[in-house]
């Protein structure tokens, strides 16, 4: 029987991407929680370049970067497909996944920075939300009729974004501004494939609230 291990952080949307893919495929795995402030030798040896989670270990082989891991899982294990079978739909799924992944830094920094830098990040995130709101009109999933690759990549904006907003007090998403996105987000969070695998929202909120407070304190400290 194949040995599958996943190194991750409980609060990380990137780790959750991999967990969801494994669950969709029905792959049994061992989850190993890492300590952000004291990373294990296994993590450092498995991802010596970036030293980050997630890391998938399959029969001793180490695979890193969440979207790379998703494709590996889809190609390696039997079970429901994560990427569409149709070449055009597969290309669309990869396009939206990359679009969403490229926006991660701006989304995160919006809630950790202040002043002009924050305003620039907010503008970029709002432009992204406009694009998504237009794309998601009358759609339940990004590509096709089932939850898949691009939807997994969207977990940061579907769930974590709302937590970031509440933790920081910076509100970007309203149903008036982005009605299609808000409708899609509500259905996403209640999707049976992921609902039971979301991290506890209250714990996630407390974690990111402390990070936002630490960032604010650092920004206001004398230089």
Curated annotation (Swiss-Prot):
GO terms for molecular function: glutathione transferase activity. Its EC number is 2.5.1.18. It comes from the Eukaryota. It is an enzyme of class 2 (transferase). Pfam families: GST_C (PF00043), GST_N (PF02798). Signal peptide: none annotated. This is Probable glutathione S-transferase. It comes from Nicotiana tabacum (Common tobacco). The lineage of its organism: Eukaryota, Viridiplantae, Streptophyta, Embryophyta, Tracheophyta.
